[in-house]
Amino acid sequence: MSTEQDAVLGLAKDLEGINLLTVPNLERGHQSKLCKEKTTSDSSSSRKPSQQRDNYRKRRPKLICIPYTSFLHTGMHNFLTKPPRDIFHESKEVALFTNGRAYTILRKDLIPNLKESIAELYESSLLEAKKRKVPYLGHDLFANIDEFVPMTISELDSVSPCFSYIENWILDNPGKDFKIGKKFTVVTTRHHIVDLTMHLFNRRNRQTSLIVTYMGAGLLSFCRNVKKDSQMSKEGIYSNDPNMKKICYSGFEFENWVTENSKVADLTGSKCPIFSLVESKLSEEIGLLIRCEMDAFNPVSETNTELKCFAPLSMHNSNHRRKLLKTWVQTGLLPNSDIMIGLRDSHSGQLLDIQWYSRDLLCKKFNHPGLPTNKKELNYNAQIAVEWCHYCIEAICKLVEANISDYSSTKPESFEIGIDTNNAIVITKLKTTPRNVELFGM
């Protein structure tokens, strides 16, 4: 057997270990058009044997595709009695970041705090909750839209707070490399992890794509792929459609309505976004530093509160179940989080109700055996979402490791990672690093 065949077999065996979770009713991902484990090789028979040995690392077969059939997951009908607590088995907040400065996580006064009566909803009886909510109901959630200035797309995707934190850590630990995982540390904004996870639960997704850049010492960054999501600047809060813009703005107005003003403002007096930096471990080999935007802090329960604004929800509506799964995933990436949902009238924009959920209660709302089964989107099973999230990150790290020039190199190398319509994860090496990618130490 040739050396190259040995290498391919070795990679295939490695893949068998991806996400082999000891969970009940394991199922294998089905792929209509099978993407076999693909490798490429730049070997040449014209090279001398000595050159071939010396350049083995350069010419070894490179893994470029991991098929969906490698994904083993819980049965879609198997809703766990107790939902997973967090997305990763180990997560902790390590710093707050706002207006260009880092702060200790104890500075909760920097985060918009829930107003007192809203903060107390988490422990209120139905009658008490109704009384506390009354003064807030009926508010026009489309008000003040003309004054609102959203974050730019580049600000939305920036990991500069993470890099600032790493730089400070290195100053305090001279001569050491910053590592959360022994092999890889992924630096990313939270929405990239959410998007990777939710790809599996939206059959309308054609492709999920992002740029992954290796910067040496095991440091990876996830970044927006500008070429593949150019429509982002025309969607959501950035849309030219006034109705779509109103719907998206209502969430920001709801935040302003139920929170006290933050103490942090920019030079114009506008409220600055505040981020929590979270260190998480997927395994001993892979860690993450995640930038999570914060909506509010509950000073009564001392929890981070995610604020959402939706039209009235029906769990018989697939879109609504998907929204709640996405919210559950999002809050699972920021430790000690709960959820407050404002329900609005779709036409008038009036606030109809305010509902508090723990992550467990929210999960039980959309993961219930009495709900219609949606096989195409894996029944929005929360446990499968966790397994798929882990699988994606492990697969990306494995693909990058197989395609970088040298693990110890400090020269940035960028790759396009795509999840296609068949849920295969594919890597393409880029000749240059895209301009929108932020680089550590530069």
Curated annotation (Swiss-Prot):
The keyword Membrane does not apply. Pfam families: RAI1 (PF08652). Residues 41-53 have a biased composition (Low complexity). Residues 31-56 are annotated as: Disordered. It catalyses: a 5'-end NAD(+)-phospho-ribonucleoside in mRNA + H2O = a 5'-end phospho-ribonucleoside in mRNA + NAD(+) + H(+); a 5'-end (N(7)-methyl 5'-triphosphoguanosine)-ribonucleoside-ribonucleotide in mRNA + H2O = a (N(7)-methyl 5'-triphosphoguanosine)-nucleoside + a 5'-end phospho-ribonucleoside in mRNA + H(+). Its cofactor is a divalent metal cation. GO terms for cellular component: cytoplasm; cytosol; nucleus. Keywords: Cytoplasm, Exonuclease, Hydrolase, Metal-binding, Nuclease, Nucleotide-binding, RNA-binding. Its EC number is 3.6.1.-, 3.1.13.-. It comes from the Eukaryota. GO terms for biological process: maturation of LSU-rRNA; NAD-cap decapping; nuclear-transcribed mRNA catabolic process; nuclear-transcribed mRNA catabolic process, no-go decay. Signal peptide: none annotated. Belongs to the DXO/Dom3Z family. PANTHER family: DECAPPING AND EXORIBONUCLEASE PROTEIN 1 (PTHR12395:SF25), DOM-3 RELATED (PTHR12395). This is Decapping and exoribonuclease protein 1. It comes from Saccharomyces cerevisiae (strain ATCC 204508 / S288c).
